[in-house]
Amino acid sequence: MAKLSRNALIGYPAGVITGIAYGLNPLFAKPLMNNGAATEAILFFRYAIAVALLGGFLLIKRESFKVNLKQAGVLFILGLPFTASSTFLFEAYKYIASGLATTLVFLFPVMVAIIMVFLKVVPSWPVWLSIGATFIGVAIMTGGNGTDSVDPTGVGFSIASAFVYALFIVLINRNKQIASISNTLLTFYALLVGSIVFLISSLCSGIDMLSGLRGAGSWLNLIGLAILPTIVSTATLAIASRNIGATKASVLGVFEPITAIIVGTLAFGEALTPNILIGILISIVSVTFMIVVTKR
């Protein structure tokens, strides 16, 4: 068995945390949407709260916010796919079950691998095998997710979310301009771009920003969205991508659909069928295989 390097010991756990944290999206988002809150408003407050928390953390650490002009341009571009991914996922929640929507986003490892091939970085055979196995596992889980009809619009939004999420991962991993920027500062600026985009979108659409967001429960959900699927998942994704590479980091995101299915079952009454259990088992085995036989 190959001995794991220091990068692997840091990157693999970070990748697992990324998947679990991001898979908690529906736990906080669905109650807000069910209360009538607009997608743009939810995402604006989610990102704005996250920016405030991260900004305070950076101030306490006395870390400089300074970036050069080229880095600012890259960070702006980096924030756009992450922003789009959240938008598409939340739109998908309107059409299909939340667990199914979040599970479909896990198509992004295949997209990452394809993008990396175009960048002349061909994954090793264990990684390809893991991608194939996890894709099969997700397909099985999707086929057993409750009794709701599958609306193609929701599927389309989920796939779009997966694609732009893949772009986000590759940008973090491949761009040398931001290599010197700390993970926390990178996350801060990516989320700052998102909060600005959602604020402009909300103002232009003329929506009531506070509609469906009144009451302590709503704000606790927004804080939950800001901390776990936003700050934690984004920061650990950056750590994983930098330590083990974009493709392996994306495969470890298998814990995202697993978490989403569990949340859907326990919180929203979505069925936990034998197909889902088999899919989870296949996915976990494939990730374990990748970790055991590969290292960086």
What are these regions (language model features)?
Residues A21, F57-A101, V105, I140, ...:
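Specific transmembrane alpha-helical segments of multi-pass solute transporters/efflux pumps
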Residues L54, L107, P123-G144, A162, ...:
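Hydrophobic transmembrane alpha-helices of multi-pass small-molecule transport proteins
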Residues L53, L58-L59, F108-G132, I258-L277:
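C-terminal transmembrane-helix exit sites in multi-pass transporters
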Residues M1-A41, F45, L80, A84, ...:
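Glycine-/small-residue-enriched transmembrane alpha-helix faces in small-molecule transporters
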Residues G19, F45, L100-L107, I172-S195, ...:
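Helix-helix packing/entry segments at the starts of transmembrane helices
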Residues N7-Y12, G36-F44, V67-A72, G143-V164, ...:
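Juxtamembrane helix-entry segments on the extracytoplasmic side of multipass membrane proteins
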Residues K30, L54, V112-A113, F118, ...:
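Transmembrane alpha-helical segments that form core, pore/gating elements
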Residues A2-L4, L43, Y47, G143, ...:
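C-terminal-most transmembrane helix of multi-pass membrane proteins
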